[in-house]
Amino acid sequence: VLGGPWQSADEIDFDALPEQFVLKCNHDCGGMVLCADKSRLDISAARTKLNWSLQKNYFWASREWPYKNIKPCIFAEQYMVDTNSSASTAQGLIDYKFYCFHGEPKFFYLGFANMVNGVKRDQLSFKNLDWTPAEFYRKDHEPFPFTLKKPRNWERMVEIAKILSAGIPFVRVDLFCINEQIYFSELTF
């Protein structure tokens, strides 16, 4: 973590942040600002987006119980670029999202946010743990337009998902593999 927690985006000292960073909320989906070049960042728009995100609570919207009593805040993280990915790194990072039942990952999807004409378009591909395509998909998201190779440390990623989901009836474990290093993203219940 580079900075925070902040209770309001107005508390953030952008001058103290590095040239590249990510600002995100601890309690929602999509409430983040990716900054690849601070000199081009619209600070006012970033503050507006983050302050709006702080007002959301997924418990009231969709009854996701982990969000009910969380105190919303903003924090800064390192901006990451995968120079080893078989996907175009100019388009973003690949998310590995494991669906785990009682400590056992059963399948996963590869998540990817692609920018098309300035509009973010999420794409995802469901796979079995052996990397064969799953027999199901989400019709509200397009599958990947390219093929990815299994990361070299794939077995370790599966093991981490098992460890993090142990003793939990259901949880989605999200990981990144960036430059052959595994990073934890989040748990979704």
Predicted feature descriptions by range:
Residues 1-40, 45, 52, 56-65:
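A conserved helix-loop-beta module that forms one wall/lid of the active-site cleft
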Residues 4-10, 79-83, 176:
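Short, solvent-exposed loop/turn elements at beta->coil junctions and helix N-caps
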Residues 13-14, 20, 97-99, 175-176:
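Short acidic loop-to-beta-strand element that houses the catalytic metal-binding Asp/Glu
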Residues 17, 46-139:
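Phosphate-binding site of ATP-dependent enzymes
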Residues 21, 100, 181-189:
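A short beta-strand motif that forms the metal-chelation/ATP-contact edge
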Residues 26, 79-80, 99, 176, ...:
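Anionic group-transfer/hydrolysis microenvironments
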Residues 37-38, 100-104, 178-180:
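Short acidic-glycine loop/turn motifs at beta-strand connectors
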Residues 69-74, 84, 123-183:
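A long amphipathic alpha-helix within ATP-dependent nucleotide-binding catalytic cores
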